[in-house]
Amino acid sequence: MSTENTLSVADLARENVRNLVPYQSARRLGGNGDVWLNANEFPTAVEFQLTQQTLNRYPECQPKAVIENYAQYAGVKPEQVLVSRGADEGIELVIRAFCEPGKDAILYCPPTYGMYSVSAETIGVERRTVPALENWQLDLQGISDNLDGAKVVFVCSPNNPTGQLINPQDLRTLLELTRGKAIVVADEAYIEFCPQATLTGWLVEYPHLVILRTLSKAFALAGLRCGFTLANEEVINLLLKVIAPYPLSTPVADIAAQALSPQGINAMRDRVAQTVQERQYLVNALQQTACVEHVFDSETNYILARFTASSSVFKSLWDQGIILRDQNKQPSLSGCLRITVGTRQENQRVIDALRAEPV
């Protein structure tokens, strides 16, 4: 048999996948630390007991208790909720449901969360960027100029990694610009730290609005991989066509339902209050640290700061087992590091290490 046209496994792969740079998650980047402040996780574990032991049967496609509990918590109808393997799956589902590969585009505004780009590239959908303004708010004129052919617009509010909320009037303008043209996805992964800013009350007014949520941050369940998509019923029904039949395992659904009980939600709110208190402590200390040029306002469980020599600071702390997130390569974030709010002991270790840095 001729081997002249034999292809390697890599050659058999789709070209866009061969060229794809995967999302650089905190775990993928690695490190050998004992102070992990690079993934915006809650710093201590929460405990749950598994109550559902029927593991020989497939789980529900959309577990009823999880959907109903989340709908009640979010103030929407159960028909407006879809649960998935983290909010990341929600990103992918929206792109798959609304974008034709090779024809349509998504649009997002860097610096922002990297999975919008990676998901689109994986699916073969064009990516358009309209960089945020100097104050990291939306460039509405730039978005308007690039809307033709864009089916989905992603906006992260509060924004990761900058930490600020997007101006609500700008969000309204964006929703009016895109009405009848594109889906607007508001990523609210960090909304528990500023719940007054949620857009859930806008769903009735804007049928093309989709909201992403997660249990990974304030609910302290990053290891569970459980996220939610909130939208009008018509959108949810479309997403149900493209989601895998059993996205949540039985143990995940069991723990998620417990986390969304009244007791679980009260515990989450206590964690948020604790985090906000620690955030203020960390901000105050950073502002009095010589190697820190600027500390940006944050509505989240992390802080973005600009350093005089960020690369050497990052490596120095890395070598001491303190793992932060380097944001130098993000547009307009030269010299910036992102620091997750940790325990008081962890936060103090960061400050002590930074104050020992040469200036």
Swiss-Prot record:
Q: Which UniProt keywords apply?
A: Amino-acid biosynthesis, Aminotransferase, Histidine biosynthesis, Pyridoxal phosphate, Transferase
Query: SUPFAM superfamilies of this UniProt entry?
Result: PLP-dependent transferases
Location of N6-(pyridoxal phosphate)lysine modifications:
217
Q: Which reaction does it catalyse?
A: L-histidinol phosphate + 2-oxoglutarate = 3-(imidazol-4-yl)-2-oxopropyl phosphate + L-glutamate
Q: Name one GO molecular function term.
A: histidinol-phosphate transaminase activity
Question: Does ATP-binding show up as a keyword for this record?
Answer: no
Read off the Pfam families from this record: Aminotran_1_2
One GO BP: L-histidine biosynthetic process
**Highest taxon of the source?**
Bacteria
Q: Does the keyword Nuclease apply?
A: no
Instruction: List the HAMAP family hit by this protein, alphabetically.
Output: HisC_aminotrans_2 (MF_01023)
> Into which EC class is this enzyme placed?
transferase
**Which cofactors go with this protein?**
pyridoxal 5'-phosphate
Whom does it interact with, and what assembly results? Homodimer.
Pathway named in the protein's UniProt entry: Amino-acid biosynthesis; L-histidine biosynthesis; L-histidine from 5-phospho-alpha-D-ribose 1-diphosphate: step 7/9
EC number(s) on file: 2.6.1.9
Record's family? Belongs to the class-II pyridoxal-phosphate-dependent aminotransferase family. Histidinol-phosphate aminotransferase subfamily.
Protein name as catalogued: Histidinol-phosphate aminotransferase
